[in-house]
Amino acid sequence: QKQKAAERRDSYLRLAHETTDGADIAVGVVQAELQLAANQKEQALATLQHLREVSPKHPYVLQLLQQLYSDMNEWQGVKDVLPDLRKRNVLDSTGVKLLSTEATVGQLEAATAKEDWHSVSEIWQQAPTKTRHSEGMLNSYVISLILQGKGKEAGPLVEAYMNKGWSDKLVYQYGLIQLDDLAAQLARAEKWMNQHNDNPWILLTVGRLLKANKEWVKAEAILRESILYGPRGETYQELAEVLTLEGSSYLQITEVYQKGLALMLSRHDSSI
């Protein structure tokens, strides 16, 4: 039924295209919109790319093309259309910069997913300084470094960002890194915690670093605080590991693990 409706739609559009003088773009835009509404992304992309060839300056075609490229995670396509979006006043300079950063982050995350570390390094090095200093770009790059086992390179990048601002995401990543000077790393994280003592992410990070430093009693207290302000399955797991190291009872440890597992399986487990 849906296929027949789509075929009828296409035949009507072909007829309109053949009989409407000078309305190629209008008919093409309607066709692309209908294809998008039907989630026919590849067909819509082909239609819009053709329309761009026919009318390179058409602002609405450019806008639809950019939105579709973004939706399909075709980040190079987004970058290719950006200059025209600016020239045709579809986006102002701020919008162009935001979209450019989003596209660069998308490219870096795609390369990370493929474990294409050479491309990750290239994307990072070629990105403008302002883009590298953005939270989203830096967080994605830090994740990539951690996955490569290069956490020691990531640490200073997080610290430099945190000296100027705040990021729950980067604070969280800092707890997944272990630098050579663990005591200094812990002291730095505790300083951040003192400024944001009700933030579950910094509390989780400090708890992790205390555990790594074998300060288990303090780690337990901080992890319990983190759960108080923002319960997460991951935090319960860390707490259970600390309780195990402290020699707590099997019953107590199991109960904590169960709470964490229940939270992970529910839809209420907050994500960073």
Can you annotate each of these PLM segments?
Residues 53-54, 66-91, 155-168, 224-233, ...:
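TPR/TPR-like (Sel1-like) alpha-helical repeat modules
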Residues 9-13, 48, 81-82, 124, ...:
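Inward-facing hydrophobic residues that define packing positions of alpha-helical scaffold repeats
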Residues 20-22, 56, 90, 131-132, ...:
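Short coil turns that delineate tetratricopeptide repeat
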Residues 5-7, 41, 75, 117, ...:
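TPR-repeat structural position
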Residues 2-4, 13-17, 25-33, 104-105, ...:
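Alpha-helical adaptor scaffolds
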Residues 25-30, 46, 59-65, 93-100, ...:
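Alpha-solenoid helical repeat scaffolds
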Residues 8-9, 44, 78, 120, ...:
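Single-residue signature of alpha-solenoid repeat helices
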Residues 2, 37, 71, 113, ...:
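Register position in tetratricopeptide repeats
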